[in-house]
Amino acid sequence: LPFLLFLDEEERDGETVLAPGRCVRASDLGLGGNNPEWKFVIHDRTRKGPAVPNGSIGSRYGEEGTWNLEMRDCYDRADLDPVLSYAELGDETEWKLAAFPVFFEGQPSLRKGAVPVRRLAVTGADGKQQERLVTTVFDILAASLAIDRGHGGDVASGYEDARAYATPAWQEAITGVPAEDMIRVAREFADNAERTGGRSMIIMGAGVNHWYNNDVTYRAMISLTTLCGCQGVSGGGWAHYVGQEKVRPLAGWTTVTVGSDWMGPPRLHNGTSFYYFALDSWRHELLSMDKLTPPDRKGSLPDHPADCNALAARLGWLPFYPQFKENSLETCEKAAKAGAASNEEIVAHTLERLKSGDLELSVDAPDDPANVPRVMVFWRANPLGSNVKGHEYFLKYLLGTESSFLGEEARQPETIRTTPEPDSPEGVGGGKLDLMVTSEIRMSTTCVYSDIVLPAAHWYEYHDLSSTDMHPFIHPFNPATDPAWEARTNWDQFKAIAQKFSELAGKHLGVRKDMVATALLHDTPGEIGQPFGEVRDWRRGDAEPVPGKTMFNLKVVERPYPDIYKMYSALGPNVAKPGGVGAKGVSWSCAPEYEQLKARLGVVSEPGVSEGMPRIDNAKDACEIMLALSPESNGDVGVRSWAGLEKQTGFKLNDLSRPVQDQHLTFEGITARPTKGFTSPNWSGIEVHGRTYAPFELNVQRLVPFHTLTGRQHFYMDHEWMRGLGESLPVYRPPLSLAAIGEISGPRIPRTDKDLVLNFLSPHSKWSIHSSYSDNHIMRELSRGGGEIWLNNDDAASAGIADNDWLECFNANGVFMGRAVVSHRIPHGKTYIHHAQERTVNVPLSPLSGTRGGTHNSLTRPLVKPTQMIGGYG
């Protein structure tokens, strides 16, 4: 909150208006040294001027001992006393009106708030000094909330002012929560936090994540708990109880999962962007960024979300695979033919081809036959029956089969080639996939549509590890019986595939060089690649293309394809090297554990690349390796794992692992008794001496910085795109009005006077159990034998709907069929269609589409939000 930011003067309608700008950096003060563009500034009461405290992200890379939250100046080490608000400085302060975006009046609009400001001498890029208006984040936050500080602006007259943004009376019209109830809860929450030292908590489920504006909603909750001093306190803060897996032994799991014990980096893709393009949701995009931005920010980012994603991939913020319009093996071969001998020369040759346009990015033409996915393998996942939004898009574009898709192509992006179209002769000629393989324990919807189904071992037929965000223990899975018939464990299935692949690779591939492009990842030096939050596109000439800084990383990886099976079946040598194991920017060597695993698991005796290395014969061996390499399950590794963080912070921290140094969780040990995970630098909780995990204790109590730009939790985000969308502060943004932008209209969507237009919500599956899901007799009886659609009794009566009637729900994305469940408990204007209602049992024909009646995701499609694409910036 004390950090300083510029107020930018902007001309609007013939008037000069102040708008919150980017944060002030050490470089703005003319200071040099290590990463001054990444060190943030406060106003120090003692020196009566600006200062640069420890803990900013600039101190994390390139120096030692100042990446900590001691309130000292990182240049002269003097103690600091930060000014929270310039209003504290009395007569030395001016008051100005600044404009803030609000989003609850239909179109985004602006309101003014009074902020106290000071004039700061700033050194420009040309070396000349100029005066700029600055204020604190606290003052900006207060002004944005319409708090009347006696200096004018669009302020609230009191809690009962329903016209003013963020008052209790204002929210009542949106949420239905009476203003007096909201005031009571807020006061009790804050009072309890004050009395207990921060032990007030906000608990939420998965619902927030299903909304387009989930990020600002989360930020609002985090801001509330931070203002009340609840972070880093046992029993305080915020927590989401969803049932997601939290991989506590993270470093060991990552090593085995991505094969970093042998080589790297891996290719990892964010699922939302992948499906947005693979399912051609972008061709039917109805959202306009200009319509979502405040009036003063029109044109500050691409209007089409697909153009935003393409720019993010180009600048290295997000991955995009396939990478190029040619095989990445061919990229290295072409470089070699052009005379490139070393890996560095191959990268340089590739970079020149990218600059000239000779080598095209796949994201620039995602429907070109050279750029589409061809093979997909699913295991422990049911994308078509559960989690992938855009079920009918999946059927139409990826599989090329019949679907109930009812949409039309919308406006197209500017920077992405829309040709060839998928159905054209030059396109893929129908579905993009040549092969879809699913490994499953049951005949799920995904299996029904797959080319090959591999029967997998069931829950009680294999070895595995389990750890969740809801308890601190690491649990084992042990087989009660062998897999039935032809079923195999997932580990054994991939082992068999690796064996056959290696056999074929010896004939057809050999050892090849692969050009791997990877995004600028969080917790790596790439996160300080693009200073000031400015969007500088190398293709447009804004900057030189520099891998790892202004664009994605490029690295040549040698692939010994004939040895894949041997590498799969043994633990590679990298884990014994310095920094060979790690996660979240912290790494260490596991040389002692490497030798211990040889004794525990045995060594490979067969000649070849893996000879003499620890064996991985089965899933249990893989679990043993994960436990051995992770500080959360091996106390000796835990003590060692703090060394890198101790250098960065200048603090002694390994005392947090000393009490468990002689403890090593083994698979046999946790089978006898599941055990709590240990404290580690990969997580922010402290779990020594019987303490229960609470996030951010390491940051608040031991002064290890948060992994953010300033090293603190942020109320204000100053990236150009965050300001462009009006989301620098945790503002209220209403749900997207999908009806208003056209999701229930179009030439293929019939409308009648009896139609009900309802807001569709998809709560967690109601009639299912995780071991056998919903398609068994007991669960089917509970759910009336098929899909169900819950709706309000008054809504049902208005359309002549009786309980248990078959209903047809539809929009541009597709059709879902289900029985009406009429209940007064459902809010007016809403419908509940529980998730994971599969199209396997009792799915009738849809009169509208002529196909079977879909799943809950038949009514959805993938959406992408630009604020969640930002990278290279902390």
Q: Predicted segment positions?
A:
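Long, contiguous, secondary-structure-rich segments that constitute the structural scaffold
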Residues: 344, 492-555, 606, 613-615, ...
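A glycine-rich phosphate-binding loop feature that marks nucleotide/adenosyl-phosphate handling sites
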Residues: 188-189, 205-207, 237-248, 511-525, ...
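Short, well-ordered loop/turn and helix-capping segments at boundaries between secondary-structure elements
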Residues: 147, 191, 226-233, 400-404, ...
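Flexible, glycine/charged-enriched surface loops at secondary-structure junctions
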Residues: 197-201, 232-239, 409, 507-514
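Flexible glycine/proline-rich, aromatic-decorated loop/lid segments
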Residues: 445-477
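Long, well-ordered, tryptophan-enriched scaffold segments
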Residues: 1-196
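Extended redox/cofactor-interaction regions of prokaryotic respiratory oxidoreductases
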Residues: 1, 107, 116-118, 122, ...
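Phosphate/diphosphate-binding loops
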Residues: 424, 433-435, 441, 480-502, ...
